């Protein structure tokens, strides 16, 4: 077991809770606000200490680039009690990996399936239905990078602020969702990209799923 200070354990539980509830880790600013730090730099110092101890991995250059590492079998709740985790063999999912999506065809059509991954379902905030290979860097500041595998749960509707997989005409995109009346904005997490605006009365739009987690592969 990795030995952590009380503050480090608090931050680690905060990261876990954020991933469980939203599918994504918190930003440094969010950690600082939650724990009453004066600046995001204080949160960064604690994150670096957690990384040195092997509790997390940090991806440079992204505000949400925090990855939990397996610390072996237990975690603490807010009262400090130790909670047992299910055995990994009982927590496996077989998820199809969707690559490029052909225009006009269902996202889970057989020709889009590049592979099948056997993964631990405890990695995700909700049970996903498929993995989508991310193309491009428009969601960089949410910690979603080109080539990442986004875990997606199929949905019919979404809440403002959630990260979704959306189909607009013949294109499939990953963006943050915002709806006002019949107008939808698909918001990037990178200032180099512009929002996509959708008029439901005129545009061909559909939600393909909700992002519930992320996997990164290294060559």
From Swiss-Prot:
> Which keywords annotate this record?
Autocatalytic cleavage, DNA damage, DNA repair, DNA replication, DNA-binding, Hydrolase, Repressor, SOS response, Transcription, Transcription regulation
Pfam families (UniProt xref) = LexA_DNA_bind (PF01726), Peptidase_S24 (PF00717)
Annotated DNA-binding ranges?
28-48
A GO MF annotation of the entry reads: serine-type endopeptidase activity
Tell me the protein's name: LexA repressor
Looking at the keywords, is DNA-binding present?
yes
Q: What is its EC number?
A: 3.4.21.88
Q: Which family does it belong to?
A: Belongs to the peptidase S24 family.
Q: How does it assemble?
A: Homodimer.
Q: Where is this site: Cleavage?
A: 103-104
- Which residues does the Swiss-Prot or TrEMBL record annotate as the active site? 138 (for autocatalytic cleavage activity), 175 (for autocatalytic cleavage activity)
Per the record, the coiled-coil ranges are none
Q: Which reaction does it catalyse?
A: Hydrolysis of Ala-|-Gly bond in repressor LexA
Known function: Represses a number of genes involved in the response to DNA damage (SOS response), including recA and lexA. In the presence of single-stranded DNA, RecA interacts with LexA causing an autocatalytic cleavage which disrupts the DNA-binding part of LexA, leading to derepression of the SOS regulon and eventually DNA repair.
EC primary class: hydrolase
| A biological process from GO | DNA repair
